[in-house]
């Protein structure tokens, strides 16, 4: 039995009773509340809600009242300069704001645990594109409490945002048992990636970490998991091979560059520092606390991950992407995939030497074509206008 999930079910019922007195407060038709789940109990100014908010702010100035529910209000005081009201995620003091906002935009499991009112409008953008690893309640070992949590989620949501056809069918409708309206808009955080508007995002990251203009970045971003055997990534080996020039074909536009390579590592927030996913090496930039994964992707010249949905986002940049998956068979058995990992359009390695070989034999045209076919197979809904489409739903429900 997943006791944590069971406790959340019980807590949600308790909250439903505790918030009853607040229901006499009128709903503010122009109030929009955003919240972005970033892992565990962390809620930040991030992910799809962030990009949707910025679109609304820029295209509808002065028309709406914006609220952000975050874990640490002090981190985001700059939003108050834009007129945003900050509330602490799930603090009792936040309940009146939660129950009087006309539209609530979340990217994950915020919605299931709060008894929103029937006249409120809850949008779930989700926090991953494509259709890759199965979500918790869709896995073979999912228990009653975990599945019950998914039912709460489906019941509370009025509009679910889908990035592709397979995600809509297999995750949204099948795993979550969601029967409501789906907007086939793609993901707000990918609009700029799809449109190629990434220059300032990349420069922001490079400036933050003092990476020179001719510097090149490889980003390692493993997803959360607990394999039976440690997964150890040798960053020094990768950097030495890249710096030596033996993989000169990896970045065609940099073939004659002599700039230094930098290794960035971003662990999932669930992953313990001394856990089974490890990186060894002397020159590692830990970017786990950087607030925006999309900006990191824009700054990276090469991405190495495993089962993360960031491959969907990064694919639109037409840059080299590889999967380091020494625990692939175990992960397939314990977690599973909506689309078999062996059919993903990126080179896969189960040893460090295999990864080096992939780096040195990379063919940009082949990966670009493979990703294009992948988008067709999954039925991509990404057009670069996700924010515009979802904003139309928000405006309609706020008027």
Where are the model-predicted features located?
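Membrane-proximal basic amphipathic "stem/tether" segments
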Residues: 1-40, 47
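C-terminal amphipathic helix plus adjacent low-complexity
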Residues: 1-2, 198, 352-399
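Short, charged/polar "capping" segments at the starts of alpha-helices
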Residues: 44-45, 72-79, 168-171, 228-229, ...
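Donor nucleotide-activated moiety binding/catalytic core segment of transferases
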Residues: 87-102, 269-312
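Catalytic binding pocket for nucleotide-activated donors in carbohydrate/polymer assembly enzymes
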Residues: 309-378
């Amino acid at each position: 039995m997943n006791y944590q999930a069971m406790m959340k079910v019980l807590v949600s019922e308790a909250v439903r009773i505790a918030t009853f007195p607040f229901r006499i407060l009128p709903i503010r038709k122009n109030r929009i509340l955003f919240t972005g789940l970033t892992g565990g109990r962390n809620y930040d100014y991030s992910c799809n809600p962030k990009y949707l908010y910025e679109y609304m702010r820029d295209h509808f100035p002065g028309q709406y009242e914006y609220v952000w529910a975050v874990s640490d209000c002090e981190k985001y005081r700059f939003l108050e300069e834009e007129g945003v009201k900050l509330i602490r995620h799930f603090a009792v003091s936040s309940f009146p704001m939660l129950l009087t906002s006309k539209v609530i935009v979340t990217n994950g499991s915020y919605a299931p645990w709060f008894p929103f009112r029937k006249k409120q409008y809850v949008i779930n953008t989700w926090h991953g594109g494509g259709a890759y690893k199965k979500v918790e309640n869709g896995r073979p070992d999912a228990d009653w409490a975990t599945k019950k949590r998914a039912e709460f989620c489906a019941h509370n949501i009025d509009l679910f945002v889908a990035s592709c056809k397979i995600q809509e069918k297999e995750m949204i409708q099948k795993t979550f048992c969601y029967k409501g309206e789906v907007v086939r808009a793609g993901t707000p955080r990918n609009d700029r990636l799809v449109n190629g508007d990434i220059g300032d995002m990349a420069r922001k990251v490079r400036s933050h970490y003092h990476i020179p203009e001719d510097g090149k970045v490889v980003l390692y971003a493993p997803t959360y998991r607990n394999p039976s055997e440690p997964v150890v990534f040798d960053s020094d080996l990768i950097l030495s091979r890249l710096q030596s020039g033996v993989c000169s074909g990896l970045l065609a536009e940099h073939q004659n560059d002599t700039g230094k390579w930098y290794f960035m590592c971003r662990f999932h927030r669930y992953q313990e520092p001394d856990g089974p996913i490890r990186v060894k090496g002397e020159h590692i930039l830990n970017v786990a606390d950087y607030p925006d994964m999309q900006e990191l992707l824009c700054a990276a010249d090469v991405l190495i991950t495993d089962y993360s949905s960031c491959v969907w986002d990064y694919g639109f940049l037409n840059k080299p992407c590889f999967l380091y998956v020494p625990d692939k068979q175990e992960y397939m058995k314990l977690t599973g995939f909506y689309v078999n990992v062996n059919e993903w359009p990126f080179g896969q390695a189960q040893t460090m030497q295999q990864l080096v070989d992939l780096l040195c034999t990379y063919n940009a045209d082949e990966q670009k074509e493979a990703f294009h076919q992948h988008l067709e197979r999954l039925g991509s809904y990404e057009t670069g206008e996700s924010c515009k489409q979802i904003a139309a739903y928000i405006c309609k429900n706020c008027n």
